[in-house]
């Protein structure tokens, strides 16, 4: 009876998150430096909206909002999968250097192609980011076999991130003057300039990864209880690990390719959702993390583009200020539990 009530409460919370996301999405459509209100939004639906408002809503705001929702959710799920894989509550795509490595590879491809006068495709950027993510994950996995302390492993991941960021800054210096501003803005993290093409591509990739992760909820749940238990339940540990690495890396790579590195969403959101839902079950956590990541990223993006309008902040700066305290609190609580 208690279990049924808890499950019902969790489903209710997920429903509330969906409603909250829809409300925030509507608010975001009406939020910006251009004075567009409910009247213009209504006119858009009945076809009587003027060209200026139409372009602002459909070309700028809607793609940006959808990108924030899709990519914020992707980062949160990526963080959850990495935390399951490493059994470490402070693992995440940004902390382990996955995002920074993906950023480096995309920067290399962008600078090389721009210098040679070639046009790079969306899939090319994703492929470059994915290779960068896999490289970082490979290094972390090698270190995991040699380093027993998970805290030390995370420190190594942070160092990998710093090295990749430093090399990226070095690479950007060799870009053409006309492209430096775009490269710099992208490297800081931003949804500015997102198009519906980017949204469609990212949605397809993210949806595929989410669907795969959700279908593997039971094996992932068994893996959370220990490798021995998972093996007894018939889980192919090696195959599951490969899937976790590929899915988390591809989710992180997709975000980095289109929006640049976005910090702390992947590490903080899974913990926030665990605290709210009082569970770590993947069947509940995967959709909850996606919704939580989407909501938080959407709020942070609204702050980034309106707080000092017309000047726009990088999304990563806002997420760092808002979510870094959550990570610090987590580390402090973890230290207190160990000392007891």
Predicted segments with their positions:
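Alpha-helical transmembrane segments in inner-membrane proteins
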Residues: 1-340
């Amino acid at each position: 009876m208690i279990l049924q009530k808890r499950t019902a409460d969790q489903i209710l919370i997920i429903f509330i998150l969906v409603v909250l996301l829809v409300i925030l999405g509507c608010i975001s459509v009406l939020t910006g430096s251009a004075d567009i209100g409910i009247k213009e939004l209504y006119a858009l639906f009945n076809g009587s909206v003027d060209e200026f408002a139409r372009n602002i809503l459909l070309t700028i705001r809607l793609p940006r909002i959808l990108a924030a929702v899709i990519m914020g959710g992707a980062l949160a799920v990526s963080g959850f999968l990495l935390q399951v894989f490493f059994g470490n509550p402070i693992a995440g795509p940004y902390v382990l250097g996955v995002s920074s490595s993906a950023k480096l590879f995309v920067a290399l491809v962008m600078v090389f192609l721009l210098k040679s006068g070639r046009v790079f495709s969306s899939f090319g950027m994703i492929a470059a980011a994915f290779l960068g993510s896999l490289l970082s994950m490979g290094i972390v996995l090698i270190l995991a076999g040699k380093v027993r302390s998970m805290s030390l492993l995370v420190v190594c991941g942070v160092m990998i991130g710093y090295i990749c960021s430093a090399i990226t800054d070095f690479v950007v210096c060799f870009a053409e003057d006309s492209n430096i501003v775009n490269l710099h803005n992208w490297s800081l993290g931003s949804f500015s300039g997102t198009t519906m093409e980017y949204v469609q591509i990212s949605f397809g990739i993210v949806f595929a990864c989410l669907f795969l992760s959700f279908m593997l909820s039971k094996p992932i749940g068994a893996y959370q209880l220990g490798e021995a238990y998972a093996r007894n339940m018939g889980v192919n540990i090696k195959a599951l690990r490969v899937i976790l690495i590929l899915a988390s890396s591809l989710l992180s790579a997709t975000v980095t390719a289109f929006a640049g590195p976005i910090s702390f969403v992947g590490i903080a959101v899974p913990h926030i959702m665990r605290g709210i839902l009082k569970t770590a079950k993947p069947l509940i956590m995967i959709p909850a993390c996606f919704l939580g990541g989407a909501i938080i990223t959407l709020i942070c993006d609204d702050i980034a583009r309106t707080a000092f309008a017309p000047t726009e902040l990088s999304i990563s700066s806002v997420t760092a200020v808002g979510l870094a305290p959550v990570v610090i609190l987590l580390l402090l609580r973890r230290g207190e539990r160990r000392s007891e």
